[in-house]
């Protein structure tokens, strides 16, 4: 007779790493990881996802919308998640802006981080009667409005001295910027200043010297001195060539808090303000958004969660996402592999 000891077994290609025994062969495993492939970005399942700030504002960049360029004002949909599709927002097509002087490019990204965003229906300041006035409100042929007349950004008023009596140099003037949002939101107040060559500065403001500007709100104070001249003629988005430039900035005012702006000639006084509340998770991505996905991943786009873990590129992700691991994980669902039993000697 032949007597065999052991258990029934077959060759096992499955190896798992254990905490106590190192690598162990087992009879069966369940893979716990997947390696995603790149896909388009999508709407996040179970929540509203925002792509462009104003989807119905045609031919408008997010910076156009944030500054209130004529023809670029509309409703910004509420969203719990937002796609940062302009990593470095492109210029606004209304008037040449000196982007390197300020944080104006960050404004669309700041707004994107809020769940609810709306533009006020009223102006925060009566610009015509502001200190140093009376002023007429300047417009530009580079900013055509809905009737194709000259216009300017809805968030700012270009304060040009109204007559020769006040078209003179001035010491620093200060205007208080009240809080006008009605639901306790953060108030994002946009302001700026215009500068040009010496001839245009004298023509518009009666002073060709560099002008000083300061804003202060929520414990943050910012100072500027304008640059006079040295600008080549520049046209934005097919508009009229401009010898001047504008510098745009913003300040965030918390509920009930007043801000201040100290200025000389060339001020762009704040007008309509953004009222923003809630938080929206922001992730770098691309448009358009196609379909739905469990997870949005900066490197892979929209992912549907098929496994609890993933390998590959590690990057920011939002939603119901698998967890990144360096190496594949397996769950043993069989027994420890034993080699085929050896025959005992015949008796």
Curated annotation (Swiss-Prot):
Pfam families: Hemagglutinin. GO terms for molecular function: host cell surface receptor binding. In natural infection, inactive HA is matured into HA1 and HA2 outside the cell by one or more trypsin-like, arginine-specific endoprotease secreted by the bronchial epithelial cells. One identified protease that may be involved in this process is secreted in lungs by club cells. It is a single-pass type I membrane protein. The keyword Disulfide bond applies. GO terms for cellular component: host cell plasma membrane; membrane; viral envelope; virion membrane. GO terms for biological process: fusion of virus membrane with host endosome membrane; fusion of virus membrane with host plasma membrane; symbiont entry into host cell; virion attachment to host cell. It comes from the Viruses. Glycans are attached at residues 25, 59, 145, 166, 304, 333. It is found in: Virion membrane; Host apical cell membrane. The keyword Disulfide bond applies. Keywords: Disulfide bond, Fusion of virus membrane with host endosomal membrane, Fusion of virus membrane with host membrane, Glycoprotein, Hemagglutinin, Host cell membrane, Host membrane, Host-virus interaction, Lipoprotein, Membrane, Palmitate, Transmembrane, Viral attachment to host cell, Viral envelope protein, Viral penetration into host cytoplasm, Virion, Virus entry into host cell. Binds to sialic acid-containing receptors on the cell surface, bringing about the attachment of the virus particle to the cell. Plays a major role in the determination of host range restriction and virulence. Class I viral fusion protein. Responsible for penetration of the virus into the cell cytoplasm by mediating the fusion of the membrane of the endocytosed virus particle with the endosomal membrane. Low pH in endosomes induce an irreversible conformational change in HA2, releasing the fusion hydrophobic peptide. Several trimers are required to form a competent fusion pore. Belongs to the influenza viruses hemagglutinin family. Major glycoprotein, comprises over 80% of the envelope proteins present in virus particle. Homotrimer of disulfide-linked HA1-HA2. This is Hemagglutinin. It comes from Influenza B virus (strain B/Finland/151/1990).
